[in-house]
Amino acid sequence: MLNIALFGPPGAGKGTQAKKIVEKYNLAHLSTGDMIRKEIAEGTELGKIAEEIIARGEVLSDEFVVRLIENSMAQHRGVNGFLFDGFPRTVAQAEILDRMLEKEGTPLKGLICIHVPFEELKRRMLERAKIEGRADDNEEAIAKRFREYNDKTVHVANHYKKKGVHIDVEGNCPVEEVFNAITKAIEEMK
C-alpha cells in the first residue's frame, strides 16, 4: 500500500498536484480542505464552526481534523493507498497518523514537501481569491495562515525527516515540472 502525504504552505499547489498523483497512482485522495469546504457548502454544524474559524485565519483543532480523516479512511477500505493532502498539519496529527497507519501495517512512505517562495505563494492565493472567492484567501487571513504554518506545521517536516521519509520538491516552476519531480520521488520510495 502506498501512503503519501503532500505537504507545503498554503498556495504551494498541493491541490493541483494531488489530482495528478491520485490519477497516476490510483490512490484515495484525503483532502482535509475539500472535506471542510464540503461541510461548509452543505451548511452542517461542523461546517458553520469551521467557516468561522477559517475566516479568522485560524487552524482547526487536531481532534476535528483527525475525526474527518478517520471517517474518510474508513470509507475507502481496499484502496491502493492514501494521498493525504493538508494533513498532518501538527506533530500531534503526525503522531496520530503514524499510529493509525502502523496499526494497519502500512506506514507513511513519504512526506513530499513542496517549496515555493513567500511572495509567490501570496500572489497565487490572492489570484485564487479572485477566481474562487475563498474566504481564507484575503491578505489578513493569508498572513495569519503563514504564521501558523511557520509556528506549527513546519515541525511536521522535521518529524518525518527523523523517520527518513521527508522529500523536498521545488514548487516554483511549471505544474508539469513539479509533477515530474514528485513522480520521480514516489517511484524511488515504492
Feature map (PLM): residue ranges:
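Glycine-rich phosphate-binding loop of ATP-dependent small-molecule kinases
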Residues: 1-190
